[in-house]
Amino acid sequence: MAETDGSIPLIPVRMLNEHVYCPRLAYLMWVQGEFSHNEFTVDGVIRHRRVDAGGGVLPSETQEDSRIHARSVSLSSERLGITAKIDLVEGEGAYVSPVDYKRGKRPHVAGGAYEPERVQLCAQGLLLREHGFASDGGALYFVASRERVPVAFDDELIGRTLAAIDEMGRTALSGTMPPPLEDSPKCPRCSLVGICLPDEVRFLSHLSVEPRPIIPADGRGLPLYVQSPKAYVRKDGDCLVIEEERVRVAEARLGETSQVALFGNATLTTAALHECLRREIPVTWLSYGGWFMGHTVSTGHRNVETRTYQYQRSFDPETCLNLARRWIVAKIANCRTLLRRNWRGEGDEAKAPPGLLMSLQDDMRHAMRAPSLEVLLGIEGASAGRYFQHFSRMLRGGDGEGMGFDFTTRNRRPPKDPVNALLSFAYAMLTREWTVALAAVGLDPYRGFYHQPRFGRPALALDMMEPFRPLIADSTVLMAINNGEIRTGDFVRSAGGCNLTDSARKRFIAGFERRMEQEVTHPIFKYTISYRRLLEVQARLLTRYLSGEIPAYPNFVTR
């Protein structure tokens, strides 16, 4: 590669390894700032602790009889355009060899090791040469098998290494992510498979057969909800401790916490907030009644490229209308399915009226043909009116009165009856979930396509949650009422509004979390996935659509 012109930073040598292994993986990690641990990467971090603790320095002047044994040596070269932290440099005088540690066992292949590892080691040797040392070879040390494999820096390997540097630099400058590997055995073991979505992207681009079920299990912990106004949350080692009036009432391990949600006047100490930011655990702030007020994250996702695509496409009226149509069609379809599945009645009224289902089907057709966002908004409103007019028929007792619940129409700000109070709270929680999911993949939750940007309103979160309102929020309300978890005595009425009591809110949150953890079969990809993981997958698919990698955004519609 020619000498860098300042348009891209120096390429980390470890990224050359990823590029030779999979160009898309290197692009995701280096250009877009994506990363996710799995058992293999965590094990690698543990096994690297000794060499990473070095901070070694090479002698500025070499002597013939001087021995060199330095760990964790950092070197860079503007001419080569690369930088590296070498695990170990050993040698004597001007003749040195880099040693790179690998977590696994030695592979019995030609050359003693796979090409990505040999290229990475050779790049380290080239850096040593740039700094005045002679380096004709190095070694790979495989920790699991405790074997050392020598690697000679011959002309062929040097040529391949220089070509890899040039290829990666050009790829980074292109601004186009390389396509996913095709049906590769590398994908299932990759820690970024749930971010890359190789099979899903190829399937949606009509390039391959149905995706393999390679979505990793949820391993990011669970949300921590703190709703007591007297709660005081502090850090104690690797835990968040919740106290009330200096009495320890609960604790949560930071490593098992995916996000923190604070209601009302609950207090989070500065030290605890700093630790959440360091670990990239988002903190959301809600009013006492559950209204979403704000979101605290660390420095934010480094994927500027994704947000650039988002902002560019959000100013395109055709893109906005196309996405909005599909969101509303999916929402109406899921509302229709919820009515059909949960309708309660006897005799001739045991099933949802065909006329109602047909009207909702017509609403879907009209929404797909809406000529403008304003017309689409009217169609959505009319369809929502039909849906909520019959919402009580899904409540136990037919009209909801058997459980003491009466619902006739949707109202809010403030909700005036128990069912509306539950719906508003569920929608606020779903908004928070989508805000967290969108920020986690590099999108701006506040720049929408259907919902217009307004101060403090997470417009894109509101866009994306439309198809999930009936599937997650409304379903949680139905289950809470029909299963007897929430009763009419669990509400406080004041100032013309209706709100949940503290104990009832805690039970409802538990029900919402159960729904988020429930697994469902994806109608397009055919694998099972939890609703929580599904939100992230859908958010990542939106980024793939906005970048032009897939032709259309695939909404989630149940049958």
UniProtKB/Swiss-Prot annotation:
List ligand-binding residues for [4Fe-4S] cluster. C22, C187, C190, C196
Q: Where is region (CRISPR-associated endonuclease Cas1) located?
A: 224-559
Q: Per its UniProt record, what Pfam families does this chain match?
A: Cas_Cas1 (PF01867), Cas_Cas4 (PF01930)
Q: Residues that bind Mn(2+) 1, according to the entry? A: D87, D100
- State where Mn(2+) 2 binds: E380, H451, E466
User: What GO terms are given for molecular function?
Assistant: 4 iron, 4 sulfur cluster binding; DNA binding; endonuclease activity; exonuclease activity; metal ion binding
Cofactor info, note text: Binds 1 [4Fe-4S] cluster per subunit.
Its required cofactor(s), as named, are: [4Fe-4S] cluster; Mg(2+); Mn(2+)
UniProtKB keywords: 4Fe-4S, Antiviral defense, DNA-binding, Endonuclease, Exonuclease, Hydrolase, Iron, Iron-sulfur, Magnesium, Manganese, Metal-binding, Nuclease
- For the protein in the UniProt heading, the enzyme class is hydrolase
* Family designation: In the N-terminal section; belongs to the CRISPR-associated exonuclease Cas4 family. In the C-terminal section; belongs to the CRISPR-associated endonuclease Cas1 family.
PANTHER family associated with the record:
CRISPR-ASSOCIATED ENDONUCLEASE CAS1 1 (PTHR34353:SF2)
The name this protein goes by in its record: CRISPR-associated exonuclease Cas4/endonuclease Cas1 fusion
Q: Which organism is it from?
A: Geobacter sulfurreducens (strain ATCC 51573 / DSM 12127 / PCA)
